[in-house]
Amino acid sequence: QDTTYFGMDTWEQRPNPRSPVDSSRGTALTTLLRQLNAIEGDFWIRLLYTHPAHWSDELIKTIAECPKVARYIDIPLQHISDHMLTRMQRETNSQYIRDLIVRIRAGIPGIAVRTTFIVGFPGETEADVEELCEFIRETKFERLGVFRYSQEEGTKAAKMEGQLTTKLKDARYRQTMSLQREIAAEVSARYVGKTLRVLVEEPGVARGEADAPDIDGRVYVPRSLPVGEFADVLITGARDYDLLALPKGEKPKEYKVAKQAQ
């Protein structure tokens, strides 16, 4: 599901795979976000799976102006090498992606950007992987996951030349995830000593605005905090992808590893 495509299928003039979110052409994601933001109550609106090709300045401005829209966006980029983006038919190119991330961060202060990449896609070269790793180092995504390409029967990619071995795909996965773990530790360390607004999901476990359920890290909080409520907590420590907001000497009952760390 591509959330940035919301409403485009109702436009009088049919959109193309690169049409930007534009409410002047009809109902769009920005229309929905503003309507949801106007609803009374205390809640977060979290945007998942936004296709980079459909992002627009209007969408960036709308998110910035709607306080109930979480300062978090999920934007699967899949790769950064033009060679691979073309083979994957991603409707974007390297320079467009680089410029888009800069625009998003400049237009939405405090935004946490989550993305996913695929390694081991047919035809991927060492140069492609090096370019991807350099992009990850430079951009320092707040949240990032990596998938190994899987040759699924019946897909176009399954018939492509240049299929890679499982051993090579595994090696490239380890290479990129090792790099991201270092970056994730840096990102988590920035929160220590700061007060963070969290939503308590279960006794002793909460989630910050920059963490989506199931895929991102957790914030471990005192078990006395009421479940289902927002709370402001002081971050006292960090562990991999997770944050600690516990009194001195208190430890979580157990750590659960985020999927992006697996």
Feature roles, as predicted:
Residues 47, 75, 116, 136, ...:
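Conserved, mostly hydrophobic/aromatic
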Residues 107, 131-170:
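C-terminal, non-catalytic macromolecule-binding modules
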Residues 159-262:
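Terminal RNA-binding accessory module
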